């Protein structure tokens, strides 16, 4: 394990084992502080229930609320909406970022669209997509798309100012690379390798939108369970339990996407 001096030194390197130990310690401290606060009721138990009560509520959620199927419902909406947003944002982002006419035509409108208050658009989405599952998927996809599209355009702009990448681009031009070769061997790998972390980071945002989406003609999902628990004002421990579950799902998604990033763009980690 790293020496105590390294633990508090500026920019010091720690071993993987030490990092894991500190990470586990952090979670244990958080759980201990939570237990201490609730044991002495420093905060109203209705506002902050005890860890025992929160984790004990999973039994009720599993037996009475069909928790497993609700998880599947929410994860399916998340994946379908996210994949749709990514599939649309990537080609459109390249068109806007690389072709001057389209950039000047709509880049400012795209930037302004990020300020759209999504909850206020629910009535519009219901009018267009009805009240079924597709409504929730399209609402989520739109919310993510608003952030992904400007992000990929920004990544294209960044490679234009990178000295190393500019040199690579100039070399390809000197070798008379075709536009398709330039895109395939230069723009696509350079931009997507920088853009993938944006995809990962927006997973967290997507779960915020899911809670909103699932309340549109509520039919199920984790957001719907949160609504039921808060609406009755008697099951606040279930709210905490579901929030913890959403965080756990997000951590798993984050881990899987980072593993995919390392597999797709090995040159970043060479």
Task: Tell me what each language-model feature is.
Residues 33-63:
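Short membrane-interfacial helix/loop motifs at transmembrane-helix boundaries
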Residues 1-25, 255-270:
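Transmembrane alpha-helical segments of polytopic membrane transport and secretion proteins
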Residues 197, 239-270:
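C-terminal transmembrane helix and the adjacent membrane-cytosol boundary/short C-terminal tail
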Residues 64-95:
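Transmembrane alpha-helix signature in integral membrane proteins
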Residues 14-42:
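N-terminal signal-anchor transmembrane alpha helix
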Residues 133-202:
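Membrane-cytosol interface at the C-terminal ends of specific transmembrane alpha-helices
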Residues 69-77, 127-149, 238-243:
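Loop-to-helix entry region at the N-terminal start of transmembrane alpha-helices
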Residues 88-127, 151-158, 162:
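Cytoplasmic-entry segments and transmembrane alpha-helices of multi-pass inner-membrane transporters
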